[in-house]
Every structure is written in C-alpha cells, then in structure tokens.
Amino acid sequence: MAHWTIEQEEAINARNSNLLVAAAAGSGKTTVLVERIIQLVLRDRIDIDRLLIVTFTQAAAGEMRERINAAFFKELEKGREDGHLRRQLYLLNRSSISTIHAFCSDVVRQHFHLVNIDPHFRIADSTETELIKMEVLEELLDGEYEKGNDGFLDLVEAFGSNKDDKPLEALILRLHSFIQSHPQPLSWLEEKIDNLALGEDNWAENPWASELSQQIKIELSAAQDILNQALKLSNKAGGPRGYLEAIESDQKWVELLLKAADQGLPVLYSCLQQLSFTRLGRVSRDVDENLKNQVKILRDESKKILNAINSLLGRDPLEYLQDLNEIYSLMKYLGEIIQSFAEIYQEKKREKGIVDFNDLEHLALQILSNEAVAREYRDYYSYLFIDEYQDSNLVQETILNYIKKEDNLFMVGDVKQSIYRFRLADPSLFLEKQKSYPLQDGSVNRRVDLNKNFRSHPEILNAVNYIFRHLMSEELGEIDYDEKSYLYPGLNTGQELKYQEIDKASSQEGKEKENTAKRVEICILENNPDLITKLEENETEEREIPGEAENDFIERIIEMDNTEIEALLIAQKIRQLIQEDIYDPELQCMRKIEYRDMVILLRATRNSAGIFMEQLSAEGIPVYADASSGYFDTLELNLFINLLRLIDNKRQDIALLSVMRSPIGGFSIDDFIKIRTKLIPRREKQPYSFYEAMEFYMEDNNDDLKDRLVFFIQRLKEWELESRIMALDEFMGKLFMDTGYYYYAGAMPGGGQRQANLRILLHRAREFQKSSFKGLFSFIKYIEKIKSSGSDMGNACIIGENDNVVRIMSIHKSKGLEFPVVILGGLGKNFNIRDSNENVLLHRKLGIGPRYINTQLRTYHDTIARLAIKNRIKLENLAEEMRILYVACTRPQEKLIMVGTTRQLESAWRRWSQPVNSYNQSRARSFLDWLIPIIMRHKKEGQYLREIAGGDWDREILWEDESRWKVKLISPWQLTAEEIRKKEEKYEWERLLEQGGYSCPSAESEEIIKRLNWKYPYQEAENIPAKLSVSQVSQISSGYLEDGAADTFLTRVPAFLSGEKDKKTRLSPADKGSIVHLVMQNIDYRRVSREDSINQQLGEMVEREILTSEQLAVVEVNKIWRFFQTKLGQRVLQAKWLFREAPFNLLIAASEVFPALESQEELLIQGIIDLYFYEGEDIVLLDFKSDIVHHKSEEEILAPYRVQLKLYKRALENITDHRVKESYLYFFDLNRAIRV
C-alpha cells in the first residue's frame, strides 16, 4: 500500500497500550502487522528477537518471517548503512515468530524439569494419539467391567447401545477433548457436574433458567411483531375487522408472558398454564379474501410460537430440578471415569516419550504459573503480537496473560471471520475486548478499527454490507453489523476512477447490458423432478436431434440430485464467464477471464467436490479440487493397501481377490471360478477362505493355474518376511518396484496424480516409523483409524498456484485468500445440527447438559440444562454459519456469483416472505433462507422475486439500498434447453461430415497450410535451459560434460530406465555432504568454545527435528571442531557480520556457458552461498566441501570449483556492492582451507 489510512497509521504507531486491531476482510492486516514490527525494529531500535509474534498456522509464521526479511533487505537496498539493521538479519533466524504450540514447545523444552518431563519428548500426530486413546479406553472399560460397580453399569445402560459400548466410548472421548480448551480441565468438569446438584434454595441462580428465559423472550417478541402485522392488515380497507378482538387478546397474552419471563421460569410456567386463545370472529361478505387469508396465516404463526413455548415448559420447574438431582450421581461417576481416562492416557504418553498439542499448552501453562519463569519471559519480550486473535481459546489467552506486561500486547483479527469453533476457538474473548476497549487514544487498553477494504470492487462491498446489516446481530450473530463494521472501499483513487469508467461504459449499452454488468449475482435453481417431466408435454418444436437422445438427457436431469444439477449450472456459468472481460488491477487494463481467475467455494467439499470435478471435466473445463477427503477411496490406494493387508494376513478374501484380479496378480474371473468349482465334488465342506481353496487346488491339480498360484503365494511369503526385517518405507518402496505398480499407476489416466498419491502414502509410512507404533500390522491399523475417524484427506496436490484451472475449495480453506471471480455454491444445503443431538451436551459457560434417562423404563427426556445448552449451541452454530458466509462473500475482487438449489420452491416462498427478524433467521435451514428474504426486501432489486412470490408487500418493509444485484430464478428446463442445443450442434456437424458436404474455404485452407509449415525462428535456443544451478554451470565449464554431454544434461534418463539398480546404502556420500552443510548452517557459532559444545548443539538439533538420529550418527564432530581451530575458522568466529545459506539469482549471457551459441539468449543462474562475512568493508567468501579428495593434487581438487567460486563472487559483489577480497574452499576431508 502506497499510502496508509489514518487508522492504519494508528495501528502502526500507537505505543504504551494494549492494542486490539479489529481488521475487517481485505483491510491489509498482515501488512499493517509487519509494518508495525518493522517500525519497532528500525525506529524504536528493538531487536527482532525481543518480539514474540504468535500466528495461527506454520504457513502464516513462514510468510511473516519472509515479509520481515524482505522489508529489511529493502531498507538495505535503499543504501541504509545501519549496524542495527544488519544485526536484525542475523537475529531473524532465531526470532520468536511461530504458532502458539511451537512457542509452548520451546517453553517446555527449556523448563522441562519443572513439569517432570523428558526433554527429548516428541510431538505425536493426531492418529497416533487416537490409537493410544483406543488402547486406554479398552484397558479402562475392561477394568470397570471387572469391578462390576453399579455406577458404571448404569452408565453403560444409559449411554451404551444394545450392541456395544461405542456410544459410551465416544462420549468419554468427546468430553475429554472438550475440556482441554479450559486451563484446568478436570477441575472445570468437576465444577460443572457439581452444578447439577441444585436445591430449591438456589434454583433461581442456575444459569440454564436464565438462558431459556432469554430465548423465550426472543420468541415472544417475534410473536408480537407478527400480531402487530396482523392488526395492521385487519385495519386496512377491506380487512377482516372481525378478527381484531382475537388478535388484540393474543397481544395482551404476549405482553403478560413477556413480563412473566422477566420474573423467572416458575412465574412464566404458571402464566402459561392459564394461556387460552379467543376464536376468530365473523367477517363481512365484502372482505378482501387475500387480506383475510394473510391475517389467518399470521395469527396461526403467532399461535404456533406460543404453543411451542408452552411445550418447552410443559413441566413444572421443580420437576426439572428433580431430574438434575437424579442424574447427578450418574454424571459424577462419568466424571470419575474421564479423570481415570486422563490419568492413564497421560501415563501412556509419558512411557512413550510423546506429548500432544493439548499437552504442550497445559505444560506451558503449568510452567508459566511459576512467577519467576513468567517474569523471565516478561522481561525478555518487549512486545507481544497475536495474529488471528479471534481464533484463540482460554488456555492460549491465559498463557499470554502470564507473560505480557501492562501495555505491550498487540492483538489483530476480525471476529466476523472467526470460523473455528469446531477447534474450540472462543470468539467471545475478542468480543469482550471489542466491547470494552475504547477507540480513543490515551487509554492503556484501546481499539483501532480497520474497515477500509483494499480487495473488492465497491459494488461487492455494497452487497456484503446490505446482506449483513440485516443478518448479523448481537442477538443471533454475536455482533451487531453496524456502521463501525461496514466495509468501505479502500482502493486508490486512480483505480476507483478506472472502475467507474468501466461500469459507466457497460451501463451505456442498454438496460440488458447493465444487468449483465452487475458484479453480484444470485441464482436460485429449482430442482423439482415433477417440473422436468412436463418438458415433453410442453416441447412442441420439431428437432433434428433424435428424440431418444433428448429423452435420455431429460431422464438424466430427473435423476440428478441437487449437487449434480448445481454443478451443471456452474459449469455452464463458467463457460459464459470465460468469454467475458475483467479488469486486472496489476495490468491496469481489461483482459479476458481465465480459468485460474475463478474459484468455486463450498461449505464442505467432502461429498461434493468429486461431483463438481466430474461435471466440470465433462464440460472440458480444467479443474482442481482442494478436497479434504477421497484420498483413501482412490483406485491406486485401495489396491495397494489391500496388498499390504494381504501380506500381513493372507486369509482375507476381499484383499486377496482384489490383488489377484489386479495386474499384480494377473488372475481372471474364470480362474476364480475354476478354483472354487473344482472343490465341490471332492470336499465334504467348503473351505473357510479363498486362500484355503487355493491351497486345496494346488494339492489336487498340476496345471498352468497351479504354477501361477504357487508363484503368487511364494511372492507373498517373501514379502511377508521382508516386511518383518525392513524399515516400513523401504519395504513399501521395494513393493512399488517388485510389482511395477508405481509405473503401472503412472500409465493410467491421471497417472501423475495417482503416482503423487502413492508417494504421499510412502511419506506417511516414513512418518509413522517415528511414532511409538511399529510394523506393518500397526500401520494398517493406523490407516484404518484415519479412515474410520473421518480424517481422510484429499488427493496429493500436483498443480501450482499459476496453473490455469478452476479451483474448488472449502470456505474454511479460502480464508485469507482472494480471487477475481468467486462462485459460491451449495447455498441451499441444510446446516449441520448433529452436534446438538448428543445425549450429553457441553458448553464452556453453561457447563454440562445430560438427558434424563430412566434405564428401567427405557425412557428419556431433556433436562433443563440440556434444553438451555441445546438452544445456546444452536444459536452459536448459526452465528458461526453467518461468519462462514461472511468469509465466503469477502473473497472476490471483481465478481461474486451465489448459487443455491431448492426442491420445494412453493413452500420456500412462504418461508422467505416471513418478516426478517432474529426469530425467523434463527429458524433458517440454509444460507438461502437468510439471503433470499433480505434480497426480496431490496426496494429495487427484489421486485423480481416479490412478483414471483406474490402476496401483499407493504412498502414500509422495503429497504432502499445502493447495492446492485443480478437475481435469477433458473428452472431445470433452462439447463436442459442449453444441453439439448449443444447436442443439436454436435448432431448437425456429424450429419455434414457423414454427407461430405462441408469443405474449408480456399482462404482458410491457405491459412491452415501456412500454419502447418511454420518453423520456429530460434531453433538453436530450444535446447538451452532457462536456468541452471551454479553446480551445473561448473560441470559444463570445467569439461565434465564432453561432446554430446549437453544433450545428456538436458535429457537425463531416469535410473529405472537406464538399468541402474538402487543403492542399498541408507545414506550416500551426497546425503552425508548435505548433512554436514545442514549442521554448518544451523550451528550457533557464538556457542562454539570446545568440541563438547558442538556435541550439545547437535543434540539440540535432533530435539528441534533439524536432524534425525540416523543423520546425527554420520556427523564427524572432530572434523567440524578442527575447522573452528583453523585460522579461517577463527576469523569466522570473530566476524561481526556473518551470513549463511544466502540464495541468489544471477542473469548472464548464455554464451558464457555455451560459447558456440550465437544468439543473444540469457541464462538465470541460481545458487546458495554457504557462508560469507565482512572484514571491514570487504567480504570473505567461504564454501564447504565434504568430497573425498586426499588422493588428488591441489589442481585436480580446485578445477571443478573455480567457475563456481567466480560466480559466487560476481553475485555477491552485485548484490552487496562490496568487494570480495578472498574466496576459500574448505575441505573437511583435508581439514584445510584452500584459497581460490
């Protein structure tokens, strides 16, 4: 951003305060955060390692570090010679820019003795911890069954199932997981369970009654609004005045109930017992039937609300109290079970030397509760930065409160984008500060609002503001979307003017063109099969296309579900968009829309992404889905995992038949039949498994099938033996080669994707080996656990960010991203409310809410605690869905298209015509139920929808707004007509080709011939690469590539094709050299005082997972120590400014590398300089070598590296504008530095 806004400057420059920055979507929060850090370092002279910067993800931490690094280099490029600045480049590598878990890990490793934990602990992944939890559950429940305690048996009876204890196990795991978001998990659980033991004397203090009263008041207010509307219609000319008495009576009842709700549930219950409704009076014959019917509908709706409230409080509050007292002992025992589970789980992890992410937070919390340790961190860090603060939880908040000073906290985020409640994020932490922190300067706690949007076109911002002004409220969405929350255009003046010119030009082409130019579009698709079947009745045109093909397509439309038909619509929409122009802010001109400009956002991709991919691919649209599922369902994974299962246990029919029928086995269905049928007359009983049938067949027969079976089983036995003695990843890699399956998968359609999926499986096996579980059986169990727990992932990503494809992703994954065109699909899908259907509900404030279950009578009903928590969870889930919708609507830069499907449009119109208020919005089933009622009330743009919906629309309830909407109601016939038109075109082309009646005009023929005969004018440059590494240039220049070697270099034959066999050694010389370079890159030179100090640092590198224990074993510490004892090593240790692993790009003439080349082509040379340091104003350059060279002469040693050092020197002098006075190669094999 060239210019900072006033609010951005405040966020950057404010000091001596705790600052909450409420940064709306697209407001440049990361840029502001980085600039504040830069100013603290450059202007306030604070070292970068004295700032603690906590990000939400590792990727965000990496991006933050890169931005800061780039900003430092930018200052250096300006000619700023500042020792403090150069020091920051050195300190940046060890600065505290990380996730909260990485910070907690550092705290625990530094103070492990305070919590009695092994400092070499490993962080387990989620699947490993799930497997341990299952072990713990089995051990725990077996022990409880042995005890035979009545309390436990009651628990099983209440929360188990008729078949097994799975529901009880799931309950224990869910409660244990939930309480981890509290600083004192088990204490919190005990306290909340004890709250169930209420007495009559403290009944009024319970939080559940208050929660229910608030919800009932919302519903009563809705009934009041409905009755007011009915009263207004009744008083109109022609209105049903005979209904006034009943409506006014209902109004009095509502007022009475509202007052009773303020006095508590017992009073409200008594009042509801007396509730009665007056019958509607007679009306005159000349009454307006339309008004009469509307009033009756409204009255019935208000009665429905009042009856629902009466049902909710259908029992005396004292009966609810009795329920809680009776269920208390059961929940108390459940609490004890969870405490036992937590203790055993912790002990299991301690034995295995692992921790999970929750452990990191709680251990860090325990350590920081020690005042001396907390003071140490408070004194060290000058400022604390928390990115994405809206996604914090109470544990993380408590950790940071321990180490913050009175006025050094900087929190940035947007509560409207808090969409991680399922990860136990607590947006109330942000909301509480947002309400309490003043905007004025001078307070130790203050707030800055960033609401200028630098991403989206103003027309999109207007639409977003219009929707959420009428949707997001404190009552339902947990925040009022008012003027302080609006998104305001932040684009620079030049760009705004350009947009105005484009929009003006579009609008001058007529009203139809003006509608097309609208940047926000909503499409309502009615997928009603009954409507589609009328196509044949209504369609009377004669068509050239055969009727059978048309009927087939109509039949296909009828069979499509909502997702499929929506995908078809979006595919058609993309085909239209690809012909349109779009403004490119970077190019500052109009250009054609490309596929890469478009993204399809879905609420969830698990069951939908595959359908969208299939439909778009069928339409010839290149597409990639960033899905979170489907990986283990792919053909290549299914077969290979079946092979692993078979090797582990041959008596598994499904796995066995799968592998035998595949190219790995090569058997046919006829072979299977032959194996089975040969046994029928000879055996008294059929074999238990197909493997046994194979064994019997081999005993009784001597033919080709027997030979193949013998060979197949022998291979299985060999693999079984190898699986026991080889490392898992090595064994799987060998299976790839032995079966040829990796290359077979690569030859299948989508082979690149399939091979990438197999490589991911190999990587998972490699990671699994680091866990506490070992062996093929455990790995298969690990994979099955991932699948059964719903932790499946999407296919491996094989595309880059610049590939020209339409992307499909979830709204969650799109957070923080932006796209020129966003298509938001699935708006008609129902919200997921499964988490409010559990037998025991949990809430961070309301506590625990169980159902009352009578195990003798096998009956159950809701306790007052569950009723209150269920209601609160529903409202919080709806608030989350609102924020998810907000995130989706704020991703586009130029165009937003929203698509939703409904099957019952008639009933939807009745629902959407209801008043827009919190009550009706709380009953929404989908995003469409929120969007359409609001758009219908747009005075101008909603007219189209109001005309279709019908009814009497009072102009007082319509809203004037500057937002512009393109609203379309699309029937299945429109989709069908488009597809039939395409089929007609195809049929016509086929007819012409068959008749031979089509030929190209002569001018077109000449152009085709001209293009076919065209030759590329720069053929000599075709074999020259665009870029080379320094090592490759050195090889070429030093004669290592002789005649014809350039071709070999450019088209290297893979090892598996050249016949070379894989090395059996685990670490090659090149690997060992990389390890030495890794050590020299990460070792802290300031701590090098003796050989032991290097050993200590190497141990720390293993702990920090920079090195593995296998890699550590090959490091020759004595050789590293000898380097530091040399004169050059001493100069390195004494250097004030020292830089390691410095990457560079250098553009040179291609003829410098390939002298025979006559063209003026250029080459990009890439390299990484191991180390350089300053002595005065000059630079000393050093490159480490681990080659075995003691048998060579000095000239032979230096020959391959002269060009390399020359390029390093040239690049350094260009970048730094300082002279390189000396260049050295240090050979660890010689323990000697050689000057070049």
Swiss-Prot record:
Q: What InterPro entries has UniProt attached to this entry?
A: AddA, DNA_helicase_UvrD-like_C, DNA_helicase_UvrD/REP, P-loop_NTPase, PDDEXK-like_dom_sf, PDDEXK_AddAB-type, Restrct_endonuc-II-like, UvrD-like_ATP-bd
Enzyme Commission number(s) of this protein = 3.1.-.-, 5.6.2.4
Give the UniProt keywords, A-Z: ATP-binding, DNA damage, DNA repair, DNA-binding, Exonuclease, Helicase, Hydrolase, Isomerase, Nuclease, Nucleotide-binding
- Please report the stretch or stretches of sequence annotated as the UvrD-like helicase ATP-binding domain: 2-457
Q: Which reaction does it catalyse?
A: Couples ATP hydrolysis with the unwinding of duplex DNA by translocating in the 3'-5' direction; ATP + H2O = ADP + phosphate + H(+)
Say which domain of life the source belongs to.
Bacteria
* Any one of the GO CC terms: cytosol
Please state every residue range assigned to the domain named UvrD-like helicase C-terminal. 515-816
SUPFAM superfamilies given in the database record: P-loop containing nucleoside triphosphate hydrolases (SSF52540), Restriction endonuclease-like (SSF52980)
- Which PROSITE patterns does this chain map to? UVRD_HELICASE_ATP_BIND, UVRD_HELICASE_CTER
One annotated GO molecular function = ATP hydrolysis activity
GO BP of this protein: double-strand break repair via homologous recombination
In this chain, ATP is annotated as bound at: A23, A24, A25, G26, S27, G28, K29, T30
Cofactor field: Mg(2+)
Q: One Pfam family of this protein, by short name? A: UvrD_C
The record ties this protein, via PANTHER family, to: ATP-DEPENDENT HELICASE_NUCLEASE SUBUNIT A, UVRD / RECB / PCRA DNA HELICASE FAMILY MEMBER
For this protein, the record's HAMAP family field holds: AddA (MF_01451)
Q: Name the job this protein performs.
A: The heterodimer acts as both an ATP-dependent DNA helicase and an ATP-dependent, dual-direction single-stranded exonuclease. Recognizes the chi site generating a DNA molecule suitable for the initiation of homologous recombination. The AddA nuclease domain is required for chi fragment generation; this subunit has the helicase and 3' -> 5' nuclease activities.
Question: Which family does the similarity line name?
Answer: Belongs to the helicase family. AddA subfamily.
Subunit field text: Heterodimer of AddA and AddB/RexB.
| Name of the protein | ATP-dependent helicase/nuclease subunit A
